[in-house]
């Protein structure tokens, strides 16, 4: 049995500018990290000649089909078609976190599945860039989904990264702050809004307003560049909360559906409880809100949100990996 273990991600700065519709004309930067929350894709063989189906897929729905073209899940169908695998395979998907909550789950699944099937078919490991490129090509070109580049890159590479994007391509740089990453990450909290939503519809609407939103996106990109300088030069992370707030204020202007009363209420509640800053993760309309809370404000913050509303996480450095059992 083969298993791909692929991290989810938290995006800090530059989100919304990682679309070629933007960076093909303006160089930009995205800052984010893979985290220690994972999606697992399991592969096993079975003898299909003894069954009335040739392929088994287990995810939110279960599929038992005779032909690859009959698979309803578009990513499964494309990846298996490209690898020319049409029988004797069973695949299970298991995620530590729900889908459609702003943690890049969909792209982490795509990266993990491509990694798994490549290892199964060719008995070889893909370089992180090749893996990210394959996932981006599949989602954006083959499936024509309205997604950016950062999710696939962070899932494939792993680590705390700056991603520079332009019409020439992208460059990934590991960020090594002068302050402790561990202590920094201990001040980060994900608060759940209780809302799951599909990012693609919101991203499509934001892309349609690109010309209207251009000045907002330019400023979001400028903030990401400022954050990169702070991460590489500052001796502490005092800047982080302020820049999160500035990014969130701009993100809400990209489309009226990015935020709503529930999200605004949670955000205001967290700021009143001592959070130095925060922003909604992902496309908008639901999912998790990231907050930065200094140690001397932690107790008040935790009294405000119970342990069913928030989750802690740590940075991870490995990206998508293959495990063999």
Sequence positions of predicted segments:
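Glycine- and acidic-rich phosphate- and metal-coordinating loops
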Residues: 82-101, 134
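Glycine-rich active-site/cofactor-binding loop and its immediate structural neighborhood
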Residues: 286
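Short gly/ser-rich anion-binding loops that grip negatively charged ligand groups
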Residues: 65-69, 100-107
């Amino acid at each position: 049995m083969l298993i791909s273990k692929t991290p989810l991600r938290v995006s800090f700065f530059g989100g919304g500018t990682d679309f070629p519709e933007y960076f093909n004309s303006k160089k930009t930067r995205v800052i984010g990290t893979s985290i220690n929350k994972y999606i697992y894709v399991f592969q096993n063989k079975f003898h299909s000649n003894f069954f009335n189906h040739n392929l088994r897929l287990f995810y939110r729905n279960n599929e038992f089909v005779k032909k690859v073209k009959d698979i309803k899940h578009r990513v499964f169908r494309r990846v298996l078609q490209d690898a020319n695998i049409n029988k004797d395979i069973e695949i299970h998907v298991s995620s530590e976190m729900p889908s459609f909550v702003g943690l890049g789950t969909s792209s982490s699944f795509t990266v993990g599945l491509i990694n798994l099937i490549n290892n199964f078919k060719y008995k070889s490991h893909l370089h992180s860039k090749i893996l990210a490129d394959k996932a981006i090509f599949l989602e954006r070109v083959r499936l024509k989904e309205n997604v950016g580049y950062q999710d696939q890159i962070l899932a494939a590479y792993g680590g705390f990264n700056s991603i520079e994007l332009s019409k020439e391509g992208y460059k990934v740089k590991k960020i090594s702050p002068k302050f402790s990453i561990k202590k920094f990450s201990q001040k980060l909290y994900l608060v759940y809004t209780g809302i799951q939503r599909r990012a693609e519809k919101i991203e499509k609407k934001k892309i349609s307003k690109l010309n209207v939103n251009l000045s907002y996106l330019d400023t979001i990109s400028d903030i990401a560049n400022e954050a990169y300088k702070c991460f590489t030069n500052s001796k502490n992370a005092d800047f982080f909360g302020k820049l999160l707030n500035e990014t969130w204020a701009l993100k809400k202007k990209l489309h009226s559906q990015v935020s709503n009363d529930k999200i605004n209420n949670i955000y205001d509640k967290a700021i009143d409880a001592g959070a130095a800053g925060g922003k909604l993760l992902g496309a908008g309309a639901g999912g998790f809100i990231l907050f930065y809370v200094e140690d001397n404000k932690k107790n008040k913050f935790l009294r405000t949100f119970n342990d069913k509303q928030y989750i802690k996480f740590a940075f991870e450095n490995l990206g998508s990996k293959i495990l063999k059992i």
